[in-house]
Structure formats: C-alpha cells, structure tokens
Amino acid sequence: MDELLEKAKKVREAWDVLRNATTREKNKAIKKIAEKLDEKRKEILEANKIDVEKARERGVKESLVDRLALNDKRIDEMIKACETVIGLKDPVGEVIDSWVREDGLRIARVRVPIGPIGIIYESRPNVTVETTILALKSGNTILLRGGSDALNSNKAIVLAIKEALRETEVPESSVEFIENTDRSLVLEMIRLREYLSLVIPRGGYGLISFVRDNATVPVLETGVGNCHIFVDESADLKKAVPVIINAKTQRPGTCNAAEKLLVHEKIAKEFLPVIVEELRKHGVEVRGCEKTREIVPDVVPATEEDWPTEYLDLIIAIKVVRDVDEAIEHIKKYSTGHSESILTENYSNAKKFVSEIDAAAVYVNASTRFTDGGQFGFGAEIGISTQRFHARGPVGLRELTTYKFVVLGNYHVRE
C-alpha cells in the first residue's frame, strides 16, 4: 500500500477512537503537543533554516519567505495557540436545540465531529500546528499534505506532535503527514471519499481552484484575499493612515492583507500624496489609476490586471472613485469575498457598505488584518472560508463539527 492510502486508512481508523475521546483526554493531548514543541524547538528551527535557505536559493520573494520562516517568537505563538485551544469550550456533545412531540418523542440536535479531515497547504509550517490542535479538540483526525517548500519544517513539527500523542490516550495516528511531495498525490487525496469526510485547501488561487474543481470529497474552500479599503470623504484622514499601513504592511504575505485602496475623489488631492509617501516609507510599491497619477504622477500605472490580483507582497493599487456607490460596485466586481473595509464618519455610508458588500468579514473603521481565528477569539483557525456553506470566515472549533439527531422514545411507532 502506498504512503497516501496507508496514512488515510490510519486516520480513518483513529477517528473511531478520537471522536469518543473526552474533553480531558483531548486537552491533555494538546498540552503535550505544546510541551513537545518547546522541547523540540531547536530541531524545528534547524529544519526550518534548511527550508528558508533553499527558498532563498530559488529566488522566492521575501514576503513568501516570511510565510515560511520560523523563529522563537513564532514557536511561542504556536505554543500559545495550544494553550488557547485548551481553554476553549469543547463543541462536541453540545445540544444545539431539543423539543418534545405531543406523543412524548424527544428529539435533540447534538453537535458531533465531522470526521477525518484532509488539509492541503503550501508554505506556512504554523498551519501544521494550528490545524492539528483544532482538529483534535473538535474530535477530528487529520491527514496533512504540506508544500515541498516547508517539508523539513513540517516533518520536524509532526515528529514532535506524534511523540506527544504517544504519551496520551489519543491515538498517534490521529495526525498523519504525507512526506511524498509529488503533486499528483493531491488529486488522489481529494478523491479519497472512503477515508476522508472533508478536504480543506489552504494556499493560492491555483491550489484552491484545482481542489474545488477536481475533488469528490466535500471541500471547505478557504479564500484568496483580494481585500479592499475604501476611504470615504468623511473619514478622519489622520486616523486612516495607520489603518492602511497596518492592513498593507504588517504581514503582506497573508490573505487578510489589503491589496487595493479606494479613495473618494473629494479627498484625493489632500490624501493621496500623504498616503503614497507613507506607503513608500514602508517599502510598498504603489500603483494607481489615471486619476491617482494626475495627483501623484510618479506612481506605477495600474492596469486591468491589477484589480483582481492578490499580490501577497508589498504592492498596492489605488483607485479614485466618485462616491461610496462606485466603491461598492468596484469591490463587487473584483472582491474575492474575504475582507472589505470602509473608513468613514458617515453612518449612512457605513450602513450601506456593510449591507451591500458580500464578504466573509466587512469592516467599518478597522484594518482587514483582524480576519483571523485568534483575533476573533476562536483560538487558532483551520482556514478562512470565503464560501457561504458550510462555514464562512475564520474556521474554528464549532465550524469543524456537524450535528446528528438523537431521538428518545418509549417504543414509539409511526401512525
């Protein structure tokens, strides 16, 4: 049996045990994982150093190297995520609602794990930990298929995780990692309906669309983030600058970073020179529409290709718009449904924007960078969903469950 089938079978078998594990047993497993990550910190960082060096040798751009790179702070964040998830309420077994029929038949809707989950992701090794601990806490086993860029990092992390599980009641095979980086395995994996209940792709548009279009296993589509910020004419321009800088530059390689800036034409002459200068101070390449270039002539001309593009880099495209209606129409045309923000002091415009923009997260006077499981209070996240079914936005513990009906009778028969 090849590696993929063998490990898929293992996670399916382990799920029969894990789905009935107690909250105490699951929390103990996650606590052990945190301890092992700390204990194996040196080995993980050494493995990651190899991946980072190889990426730089291949000329990978720095924003993507940043997604790949680990350091002590990021290991600490993984450990903190474990501690956070331990503290979260276990959704499994929750009675969502219940009722009693006139004949005394009792019906309850009870939250249960989804089942073995396949995760296909690219260059972020922290995903290995975040997805694992959320899966375990929600009673789901997990089959991981990371990108070749992070192979050494992921192997070191999974080794620590499996060592931790061996010291607990949770089966070691609750977490399996596919070491073979052959891309043809992705197609095989997303068709393993016999073993997997759900597949979640985390990565760029190419990966996500391939999985969505070819899978026979149900897919939870995590999103490409072509995120916009609209600066309305009533916005506090002094306060708007740090919001835009945060949204674009804090971590430009993430899906919740701002990629486009829309500016109301009535404030464009005043605001554009200020924000362009500030963006450039932070190393951002600024592209702009014709109206933007009339005000700041030395920005790079934006083309039609720019508007739908997720840069994942220190690049932003600016468009001057007539009003909130034109901003909304532009976003409707080019948005990926991830995160969209308006900066305004006008209540009516804020209400209109929130009502008409169709996205997983819509912001008023805040950075798009908050679309994140940790920031929303879910602990870690297994991805950010841009679809409307079965989950939307940051996918936390509750979104990794489904439900079943438990029906209690007294030898009832249907008339």
Swiss-Prot record:
Highest taxon of the lineage: Bacteria
Cited CDD domains: ALDH_F18-19_ProA-GPR
Catalytic activity: L-glutamate 5-semialdehyde + phosphate + NADP(+) = L-glutamyl 5-phosphate + NADPH + H(+)
Record carries keyword Glycosyltransferase: no
Disulphide linkage map: none
Subcellular location: Cytoplasm
Protein name according to UniProt: Gamma-glutamyl phosphate reductase
